[in-house]
Amino acid sequence: MPIGKSAAAVTPRRIAVLSVHTSPLAQPGMGDAGGMNVYIWQTSLELAARGIEVEIFTRATSSSDAPIVEAAPGIRVRNVVAGPFEGLDKTDLPAQLCAFAAGVQRAEAREEPGYFDLIHSHYWLSGQVGWLARDRWGVPLVHTAHTLAAVKNRALAEGDTAEPQARIIGEQQVSDEADRLIVNTEVEASQLADLHDVPLDRIDVVYPGADLATYTPGDGAGARRELGIAPDELVLTFVGRIQPHKAPDLLLRAAAPLIHAHPDRRIRILVVGGPSGTGLERPDALIALARELGIEHAVTFEPPRPPAGLAEVYRASDLVVVPSYSESFGLVAVEAQACGTPVVAAKVGGLSVAVADGVSGRLIDGHDPQEWTAVLDELTANAELRTELAAGATEHARRFSWARTADGLLNSYAKAIEARQEATQTVRRRRRRAGVRA
């Protein structure tokens, strides 16, 4: 560890994890639940396994949410009441940050002094709360943005809504105040430095991972039978929230010409996910698009699945398609590759790291449906190439594990704690010197 002190001296005993707008216990693929939920839950499991207590603060969204949930050994989820349980969109939550911050502060005040050693906030809403808690508790704040409004606004999908200026300002404030900033890839580090003027020496690049015990290669025949997919069908799968940003419509538009021109390939499109966001947010809209394109018979819609079920979907697929307009990483891509399924993805953000172009799949620059059709045509016509990419996918995915992610988090935490300790000692020395002179 490139830190001056021993690991024990800079390893937190207990951390407060802030996730205002979505609970790590929620099902990914529905509403606002997605990769961030998976990230928080999996890293919490890894940290708890190393003896670090993790308390996750999230907003209660149901009257049945218990105030405290002992979610796993060493992991406690605190459901904070902040605004009505239902009827609030993520865009409404800035008005509830005061209530949420009050709940966090009151929970900490009921514990002994020095209860938390560090705060790790996720997404800018949580960063605002973490900023206040950091100053109140006198502990370091480590922040992970997961997405940046300015990046998203540069690449809006048709029908999507631009992120408001208030969010951009909020992200700037958190970027200025956090002790350390964690990003998913070197691409995101460059974006954060350029857009928010953050010195690179305050940024730590930590790759997310995949649960390599769950997402493994295997026989997808059982999943195909369950989904009503024939053994000889070529399955192109989209997994994620149904929103313009994720671009599931691009898969339909790109595959439609192939379905019409090559009925012998028996191409099946599988869409796994639920509604979220603005614009093209309901499966009904995609169903209507499939009908318009004349491929309704070849498209299957499935609700989100838990990890074990999702692994079966990946194994049942010949290709997983990730056509997002922006991604800070792309967990779906890594999970699919870990199951031995090649990925066709947009060459944006962290997907250029998550997918090894020509080795574990293909990266496509841009969102022109014709270019996507050409790549899908090549891959659906060449079983040998798909087999080669499948082998490369499994190997590439081994680079990404949650254990390695936890190693990176602990390194960032250590830097933050040590810097805070040194700053405190400097202040004390100055005060002592001032006292002597007095």
Swiss-Prot record:
InterPro entries from the UniProt entry: Glyco_trans_1, Glyco_trans_4-like_N, Mycothiol_biosynthesis_MshA
Protein name in the entry: D-inositol 3-phosphate glycosyltransferase
Residues given in the record as 1D-myo-inositol 3-phosphate binding sites: 21, 32-37, 90, 123, 147, 167
Reaction(s) catalysed by this chain's protein: 1D-myo-inositol 3-phosphate + UDP-N-acetyl-alpha-D-glucosamine = 1D-myo-inositol 2-acetamido-2-deoxy-alpha-D-glucopyranoside 3-phosphate + UDP + H(+)
Complexes and interactors: Homodimer.
Binding site for Mg(2+): 314-315, 317, 341
Pfam families per the UniProt record, alphabetical: Glyco_trans_4_4, Glycos_transf_1
Gene3D superfamilies found in the cross-reference section: Glycogen Phosphorylase B
EC supergroup of this enzyme: transferase
Enzyme Commission number, as recorded: 2.4.1.250
Keywords, ordered alphabetically: Glycosyltransferase, Magnesium, Metal-binding, Transferase
Species the sequence originates in: Tsukamurella paurometabola (strain ATCC 8368 / DSM 20162 / CCUG 35730 / CIP 100753 / JCM 10117 / KCTC 9821 / NBRC 16120 / NCIMB 702349 / NCTC 13040)
Domain of life: Bacteria
